[in-house]
Amino acid sequence: MALFKKNYDRHTHMHGKAGNATLSRSHAGNFCVFLFLLIVGAFMALPLVYTLVQSIKPTEELFTYPPKFYVKNPTFDNFKQAFQLAGNLWVPFTRYLFNSVFIAVVGTSVYILVASLAAYPMAKAKRLPGMAFLSQLIVWTLLFRTEVTAIPQYVVIAKLGMVNTYWSILLPALAGTFGVFLMRQFMVSAIPDAILEAARIDGANEYKIFWRISMPCVKPAWMTLIIFTFQSLWSATGGTYIYEESMRMLPNVLSQIAAGGIARTGAGSAVAVIIMIPPIIVFLISQSSVMETMAQSGIK
């Protein structure tokens, strides 16, 4: 009995040491991963930090060499200069702002609806003929870069008479397939077929099932899609389809102000900061849903 107890204690002690060593290695590995991601995140944030610092630097600090990532005497003169220059443009600044807000808000809202309506039958109407092929076709279209379809898109827009209109920006955006792919993949795994069948048995039509069951279940997906779509449309310039100055977007203000040479470096940075604010706000509002989407994608 004593010999058995001695062997048991030795065995437990050895396994305890092995468990502690494994736990220590796990903590060390997690720390290394965290440190690596922290360094990568810092490098990714450097352009944003540098632009923000440049926007509040006085003129005498803007052109120091080597460039500094800090400011000794912060000032908002660059923002004042930016608004003064924006007031002297051919078209009022508010017109550029309205164009960008209209395109971003309307385009994002309509695209979420279109992508969801297109993805729902691909994910849940499996009995319809051609759904599998159509789903594969959506994936294939993701292989083509925007430059490949630029000329065909322009020809279509020109033939439809939509040049110099909001439709020249909205229509190509609404035809994007990334949102359809994202929503379909999420609907396949996030919406159980049993729930849909139970709703149909209870007398719910497809319209109610889509809005009251399907869309709430895939909220993380369409919140993520809102961020990507809003960012894409907010930064759109419409340079290919828009020629009238009154129809141009807010990023054109940055290009016009920056065209003044190095004397407008600070004002250009100030405008860049102003343009970055709305997408950052949208991301912060939707951040929790984005993290949930990434977590569920990792689980799948």
Question: Whereabouts are the PLM-identified features?
Answer:
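A hydrophobic, multi-pass inner-membrane permease signature
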Residues: A2-K300
